C-alpha cells in the first residue's frame, strides 16, 4: 500500500499525510486504513478535531496491525498535528515519541523531518524554545519544500519570541528570496515574518502593519483563523509601536475574539490583556444566567 503526502492548512498550517489516490497502486489496498485516513482528513476540513483525532488513532492502529511502516509514520504525524491544533502540545509530543519508537522497531531509524516539524511546533507552544529551535532547524533541512517553508516560518516565530534577531533576519531573507508563483499560504507566512522583522529592526511601522494585514487577509480567505488572529496581533504591535494606541487596542481585541472562537484560549487571553478596555462584548456569547431570588 503506497501512501502520499497531501497538504492542508491546519493550525500552524502543517502538512497532513494522506493515504492512497493519485498514483497507480500495484498491490491490494487496505480500504479500512484508507477510509480512516480519509474520514479524519475530512473531519479536519470541517474543524471537527476530536473526530479527526479519533480517526487518525484508528488509522494508526490499523497501520500497526498491517505492520506498515509508512502508514504508521503518516498516522502518527497526522495524529500529533491534530493534537497540536487542539491545544494539546504535550499529547502531541507523546505521540511523536511513540511514533519514532514504532518506526525504529521496524528499521526506520533516520530522522523524519515531518515529525521534527510538528515537534518544533509543540515545543514552541510549551515555551521550550531552545529545543523548538533545534527541531525546526532539523526540519528546515528536509527535501520536501513544503516542510522546509513551514520549518522556516516556525523558526521565525521562535526567533521573534525569544529575541533572536539574527535568526529572524535570516528567515526574512529566506522568504524574500523565494521566486516564482508561490502558494498563498507561503505569501502570508512571508508577510508576517517581514512585519515581525521590521518591528524588531526599527523599520517602517506602517509597512509592518500593512504586511501583517495582508497576511491576515490571505488567511481569512483560506479559513485559517488561528494564524489570521496571530497576524492581527502583529498588526496590533505595529500600531502600538507607531503610537496609535486606539488602533492597537482594536487589533488586539479582534485578534483576541477570533482566537477565542477558534479555540486558542491562551492567545485570546494574552491579546485581551493587551487590548485592555477595548475588548468589545461578544454579541454571540450565551447570556449570563441571572441570579433568581430564592423563595422562603
Region roles according to the model:
Residues 2, 7-10, 14-78:
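N-terminal leader/linker segments that initiate helical-solenoid repeat arrays
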Residues 206, 250, 254-296:
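Terminal, low-structured helical/coil segments at or just beyond the last alpha-helical repeat
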Residues 25-27, 65-68, 105-108, 141-144, ...:
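Short coil/turn linkers that connect adjacent helices within long alpha-helical scaffolds
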Residues 34-35, 73-74, 114, 150-153, ...:
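Residue register of alpha-helical TPR repeats
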Residues 52, 92, 132, 167-171, ...:
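Single-residue signature of alpha-solenoid repeat helices
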Residues 46, 66, 86, 126, ...:
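Structural motif corresponding to the intra-repeat A-B loop/turn of tetratricopeptide repeats
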Amino acid at each position: 500500500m503506497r501512501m502520499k503526502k497531501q497538504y492542508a492548512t491546519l493550525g500552524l498550517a502543517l502538512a497532513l499525510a494522506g493515504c492512497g489516490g493519485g498514483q497507480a497502486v500495484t498491490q491490494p489496498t487496505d480500504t479500512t486504513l484508507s477510509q480512516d485516513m480519509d474520514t479524519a482528513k475530512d473531519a479536519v476540513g470541517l474543524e471537527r478535531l476530536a473526530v479527526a483525532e479519533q480517526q487518525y488513532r484508528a488509522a494508526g492502529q490499523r497501520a500497526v496491525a498491517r505492520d506498515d511502516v509508512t502508514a504508521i509514520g503518516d498516522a502518527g504525524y497526522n495524529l500529533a498535528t491534530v493534537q497540536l491544533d487542539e491545544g494539546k502540545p504535550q499529547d502531541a509530543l507523546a505521540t511523536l515519541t511513540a511514533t519514532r519508537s514504532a518506526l525504529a522497531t521496524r528499521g526506520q531509524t533516520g530522522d523524519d523531518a515531518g515529525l521534527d516539524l510538528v515537534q518544533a511546533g509543540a515545543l514552541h507552544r510549551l515555551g521550550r524554545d531552545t529545543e523548538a529551535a533545534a527541531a525546526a532547524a532539523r526540519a528546515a533541512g528536509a527535501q520536501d519544500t513544503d516542510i522546509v517553508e513551514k520549518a522556516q516560518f516556525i523558526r521565525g516565530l521562535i526567533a521573534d519570541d525569544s529575541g533572536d534577531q539574527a535568526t529572524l533576519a535570516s528567515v526574512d531573507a529566506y522568504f524574500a528570496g523565494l521566486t516564482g508563483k508561490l502558494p498563498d499560504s507561503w505569501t502570508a507566512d512571508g508577510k508576517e515574518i517581514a512585519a515581525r522583522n521590521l518591528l524588531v529592526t526599527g523599520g517602517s511601522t506602517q509597512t509592518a502593519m500593512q504586511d501583517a494585514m495582508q497576511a491576515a487577509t490571505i488567511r481569512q480567505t483560506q479559513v485559517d483563523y488561528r494564524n489570521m488572529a496571530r497576524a492581527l496581533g502583529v498588526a496590533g504591535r505595529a500600531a502600538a509601536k507607531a503610537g496609535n494606541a486606539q488602533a492597537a487596542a482594536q487589533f488586539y481585541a479582534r485578534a483576541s475574539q477570533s482566537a477565542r472562537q477558534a479555540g486558542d484560549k491562551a492567545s485570546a487571553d494574552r491579546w485581551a490583556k493587551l487590548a485592555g478596555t477595548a475588548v468589545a462584548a461578544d454579541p454571540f456569547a450565551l447570556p449570563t444566567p441571572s441570579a433568581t431570588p430564592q423563595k422562603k
